[in-house]
């Protein structure tokens, strides 16, 4: 995995995925973990989790993202399962840093939300 692969995925996610911008910190964390966990499962050929309505929601977003990743980035089919997990973990970290920790939106942690 290279830094450019992570940059590609981050740019794609920032541009195309609205689930990262939910209104509360816990929503954003839950979506980042849930959707990207399902993306990792799909890209590594594992069966996605679909036992609960929440898992099915994450799966729906992940399916579109995984298909786009395969279509847009030729390197996605050339990296192994370990590299995919490493890449997704790096993407999760960067998203948390960008959309939660570095966010200036004070409503993310407002006590009335």
UniProtKB/Swiss-Prot annotation:
The key enzymatic reactions in nitrogen fixation are catalyzed by the nitrogenase complex, which has 2 components: the iron protein (component 2) and a component 1 which is either a molybdenum-iron protein, a vanadium-iron, or an iron-iron protein. Its cofactor is iron-sulfur cluster; vanadium cation. Hexamer of two alpha, two beta, and two delta chains. Transmembrane segments: none annotated. Coiled coil: none annotated. GO terms for biological process: nitrogen fixation. This is Nitrogenase vanadium-iron protein delta chain. GO terms for molecular function: ATP binding; iron-sulfur cluster binding; metal ion binding; nitrogenase activity. It is an enzyme of class 1 (oxidoreductase). It comes from Azotobacter chroococcum mcd 1. Pfam families: AnfG_VnfG (PF03139). InterPro entries: Nase_V-Fe_dsu (IPR014279), V/Nase_d_su (IPR004349). Its EC number is 1.18.6.1. Keywords: ATP-binding, Iron, Iron-sulfur, Metal-binding, Nitrogen fixation, Nucleotide-binding, Oxidoreductase, Vanadium. It comes from the Bacteria. It catalyses: N2 + 8 reduced [2Fe-2S]-[ferredoxin] + 16 ATP + 16 H2O = H2 + 8 oxidized [2Fe-2S]-[ferredoxin] + 2 NH4(+) + 16 ADP + 16 phosphate + 6 H(+).
